[in-house]
Amino acid sequence: LPERQPPRHLAIQINQALHDLLCKYPSSLLFGEDVAQKGGVYTVSKGLLKAFGPRRVFNTLLDETMILGMAQGLANLGMLPIPEIQYLAYLHNAADQLRGEACSLQFFSNDQYRNPMLVRIAGLGYQKGFGGHFHNDNSITALRDIPGLVVGCASRGDDAAMMLRTLAALAQVDGRVAVFLEPIALYMTKDLHAAGDGQWLFPYPAPDQALVLGEGRVYAAEASDLVIFTYGNGVPMSLRAARTIEAELGWQVRVVDLRWLVPLNAGFIAEQGADAQRVLVVDEGRHSAGVGEGVITALVEAGLGHLPLQRVCGADTYTPLAGAAMCVLPSDNAVTSAARVLAQDH
């Protein structure tokens, strides 16, 4: 059983969680580009075709509009589709299938009709050796204002497994359209601070464990000198930066992994900011219309606009090729530099 295995990385635990979901929900189907025989570009769906057969795990055409359109049709027939969009940038070809069709059906039919689905999307930045905009898209803005949509993003394996269970239950029970955003650069990550430390490997959670919708993960909850809000690749980045900040400035640093990006849990954000001396928002998305804007808005609307605050985020541009990508994305050094600015000003 996976819960009896040693701690594992993100990709393996997503694979194990998908296996569990296909066992739990007999009506579930997993499909997308290269998900079957190949097991996905990053082997995340490896072995699922052999375990469940071609009627439940199958490849599709290279057409995201068709993939999401087929998911709606299958959902209307009583199935639980788990479609994969191979890369986040590819979603934009088919965004209206979510915005104008899938997410609006319950609303416009007064809940007479539902088309539940759990959409897996591999994305975000920092992927090395294979990239450019179409494989390292860091923007989820197109998903942020779709009514009824739920978007989760896990940065570590155990959270991923529990989040998938929650999203699948939301789809199956409430008929929700859910998106599970998978940070490609963290798929195989095992270490946090130094090579070989194994600090980004985690035990697989027992089958009865799931996440509470909207609840983030808090590291060093008692610390309040600086509170960092982040998600995805920003979580290990902020944890590494926190160690440097603590050594250099003598601050105790709390890191808050939002986990749930749509809708943002404003109450949770306000709760974490209430005792903060300073706030730093680390958002790998773009400067305009990114998740960070929502975090800051939640703090201001909770009456916390007086707090000293800095934001580290991606530039308003496309992700370039090779090492140039690092010039437009947040980094460990950018996070520590923002903390130094807060120290100078406050």
Predicted regions, residues:
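Thiamine diphosphate
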Residues: 1-177, 181, 185-187, 194, ...
